[in-house]
A protein has these predicted regions:
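NAD(P)+-binding Rossmann beta1-loop-alpha1 motif at the extreme N-terminus of oxidoreductases
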Residues: 2-49, 179
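Active-site phosphate/pyrophosphate- and oxyanion-stabilizing loops and adjacent acidic/basic residues
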Residues: 48, 88, 125, 175
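Rossmann-fold NAD(P)-binding glycine/threonine-rich loop
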Residues: 103-144, 150-152
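Active-site-lining helix/loop region of Rossmann-like oxidoreductase modules
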Residues: 158-222
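A glycine-biased structural micro-motif
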Residues: 6, 44, 70, 96, ...
């Protein structure tokens, strides 16, 4: 098992539901977390809320650049339309670090959610292009922000597909997934296959709407 208990995880988009929910769960599991936002005061306000909810002190809030510089591993949980520009502005701060991209390029119309076409192939591959000196992975696409935020749900019952071309980096991300009760990190292939994982989120949203659920996925026979 890869040791991750001493790592500090930065969350870009840490004031938004997905990033904030993962930060809450990691902090509750004993992982130090730093939230990133365009405004440091907004990030610190969110961090104060999570400290109270999780009953811990190891959550801080900084602006995005300071968050990226301070963390050992950085989760990208920002809106798709600002994805490229934000990562491009943080190239130096993210150099040499494991970056976990959980962004889903989706559109919505009267028929529901659908996957957008990404020039680079996927959000994760775009991150890889923009951050050539970082160790880019893709994971945490299929996690319900509602379930993450509800600490009364003690077992989230979910497999987290982890993609990437760096074995050590994907092992770290899998181990970070495993720290959250009910999560299991599962290697899901090379980064070039991330578009399939990102697009599947549209199907899960459709399932959730039809069945009034917070669906995830499980991989069998492993």
């Amino acid at each position: 098992m890869t040791e991750v208990s001493k790592l500090k995880v930065g969350v870009l988009g840490g004031t938004r539901p997905q990033g904030k929910g993962l930060a809450l769960r990691w902090a509750a599991a004993g992982i130090a977390v730093v939230l990133g936002s365009r405004a440091a005061d907004r990030a610190e306000s969110a961090a104060a809320e999570l400290r109270e909810r999780a009953g811990v002190e190891h959550i801080t809030g900084l602006d995005n650049a300071a968050c990226a510089a301070d963390a050992d591993v950085v989760l990208v949980a920002v809106p798709w339309d600002g994805h490229r520009d934000l990562l491009g502005s943080l190239r130096d701060e993210l150099a040499g670090k494991i970056v976990i991209d959980c962004v889903n390029p989706l559109g919505f119309d009267k028929q529901g959610p659908f996957a957008l076409t990404v020039e680079e192939g996927s959000a994760a591959q775009q991150a890889e292009q923009v951050l050539p000196d970082s160790r880019v992975t893709a994971a945490f696409h299929h996690v319900s922000a509602v379930s993450l935020a509800d600490l009364s749900i003690t077992d989230l019952d979910l497999d987290v597909l982890v993609l990437g071309d760096d074995r050590e980096a994907t092992d770290v991300v899998r181990a970070l997934a495993d720290t959250i009760p009910g999560f299991r990190g599962v290697y899901g292939g090379r980064l070039r296959n991330a578009h399939q994982v990102e697009a599947l989120t549209a199907n899960l949203i459709a399932i959730n709407r039809r069945y009034k659920a917070h669906a995830g996925i499980r991989v069998t026979d492993i």
